UniProtKB/Swiss-Prot annotation:
It holds the Pfam family FKBP_C. It comes from Shewanella woodyi (strain ATCC 51908 / MS32). NCBIfam families: tig (TIGR00115). GO terms for cellular component: cytoplasm. Its main location: cytoplasm. InterPro entries: PPIase_dom_sf (IPR046357), PPIase_FKBP_dom (IPR001179), Trig_fac (IPR005215), Trigger_fac_C (IPR008880), Trigger_fac_C_sf (IPR037041), Trigger_fac_ribosome-bd_bac (IPR008881), Trigger_fac_ribosome-bd_sf (IPR036611), Trigger_fact/SurA_dom_sf (IPR027304). The gene is tig. Consists of 3 domains; the N-terminus binds the ribosome, the middle domain has PPIase activity, while the C-terminus has intrinsic chaperone activity on its own. This is Trigger factor.
Length: 434
């Protein structure tokens, strides 16, 4: 086998490989003979079909298969000999060949050489926080509202009420698509409608008809409505006031607390909030570390890896549409390119961190991650058992653990300062960013 290596551009490499033509001819002849023994063709006894007949029927397909196998096998031998690390599958193109030699060209990208830089310049503001009794009380108040019952009242609508309304929206006197509804149930104070809409309903009583003027935000999802001033003609059909359940032992039973009453519920809420806080704090630090790592290190990215990641992200996005995905056009790659590039770059850089620090997934950490995740389920032991019995899921969890260890290794050399943060403000911000 003769091999020549050519750098075409960037990370792309081109191998020209020449092998004895006899390799292919012998393999083709052997395959034809084997097929002749197995073939069942009318007019011939089993195992007695002439090779010439098999060649006429299947020779072209057999030669293509053998040629592909020879190219793949010799390509692998060539990249090992030349110490090349391909990123993605190669493309094979047959080259100039004669009776003695078969030549082909393999084109592919290689992984970039990664040399970590500026790790000591990564700046991280590490947030610290605790779940207080006041935070637990706030959560209980939220749960009360979620379990509220509503009844019609004759007073003016106020924050926290539900209002059933008819509305017709118009811009410059013309109605617009999606701006009309009847008997629409509006939760006042929820912030789900555009600014000014909910507050415009407050203060009015059932039976009143009135207009509200609002401005659509510049970042509104409908392009034709961004920044536009709209008038909504409102008919208020009914105002409903909330009746909140009392916070007592009976309230605790609504959440499956059979023993311990209200105090047990508070303890469970505090535990869950603490777990969520810990996850959010770790995610925040990880994001800062990765952003710093990316800022300090510029590397060339294999286009094949980006394309592969785009496909993964595209499939994930389509899955979120469920049954509707079948009737949707394919989402354009541009939607995912930036995210794909980030994921590929992070993967390559963290891979080098893992290699440099000789990291291996700590089994104790892996089990801790599984236990933490399982604690959110009704039967944690069942979830732990399921994970431990599934090799693919265990490998995924080991990858998570290894990534955590890599981030911790980077933190050791980073410039870290601590900052105390309010639980509610921090979690609200984390939810918005997530």
């Amino acid at each position: 086998m003769q091999v020549s290596v050519e750098t075409t551009q960037g990370l792309e490499r081109r191998l020209t490989i020449s092998v004895p033509a006899e390799q292919i001819e012998k393999a083709v002849n052997d395959s034809l003979k084997n097929e002749a023994k197995r073939a069942r063709i009318p007019g011939f006894r089993p195992g007695k079909v002439p090779v010439s007949v098999i060649n006429k029927r299947y020779g072209k397909a057999i030669r293509q298969d053998i040629t592909g196998e020879v190219m793949q096998r010799n390509f692998v031998e060539a990249i090992i000999a030349e110490k090349l690390n391909p990123a993605g599958a190669p493309t094979f193109v047959p080259g100039e060949s004669d009776a003695e030699n078969f030549q082909f060209v393999a084109t592919f990208e290689i992984y970039p050489e990664v040399e970590l830089k500026g790790l000591e310049d990564i700046a991280v503001e590490q947030p610290t926080s605790d779940v207080t009794d006041a935070d637990v009380d706030t959560m209980i108040e939220t749960l009360r509202k979620q379990h509220a019952t509503y009844e019609a009242v004759e007073r003016a609508a106020a924050d926290g009420d539900k209002a059933k309304i008819n509305f017709v929206g118009s811009i410059d006197g013309e109605e617009f698509e999606g701006g009309k509804a009847e008997d629409f149930e509006l939760q006042l104070g929820s912030g789900r409608m555009i600014p000014g809409f909910e507050s415009g309903v407050e203060g009015h009583k059932a039976g009143e008809e009135f207009d509200i003027e609002v401005t659509f935000p510049e970042d509104y999802h409908a392009e034709n409505l961004k920044g536009k001033v709209a008038k909504f003609a409102i008919t208020l059909n009914e105002v409903q006031a909330a009746n909140l359940p009392e916070v007592n032992d009976e309230f605790a039973t609504l959440f499956g607390v059979a023993e311990g009453g209200l105090e047990a519920l508070k303890a469970e809420i505090s535990k869950n909030m603490g777990r969520e806080l810990e996850q959010a704090l770790k995610a925040n630090v990880k994001e800062q570390v990765l952003n710093g790592l990316l800022e300090q290190n510029e590397i060339e990215l294999p286009a094949s890896l980006i394309a592969g990641e785009v496909e993964v992200l595209r499939k994930q996005a389509m899955q979120r549409f469920g049954d509707q995905a079948a009737n949707m056009p394919e989402l354009p790659a541009d939607l995912f390119t930036e995210q794909a590039e980030r994921r590929v770059k992070v993967g390559l850089l963290l891979g080098e961190v893992i290699k440099t620090n000789e990291l291996k997934a700590e089994e104790e950490r892996v089990q801790g991650l599984i236990a933490s995740m399982a604690s959110a389920y009704e039967d944690p032991s069942e979830v732990v058992e399921y994970y431990n019995g599934n090799q693919e899921m265990m490998q995924n969890m080991r990858n998570v653990a290894l990534e955590e260890q890599a981030v911790e290794a980077l933190l050791k050399t980073a410039k870290v300062t601590e900052k105390a943060v309010n639980f509610e403000e921090f979690m609200n911000k984390a939810t918005q960013q997530g």
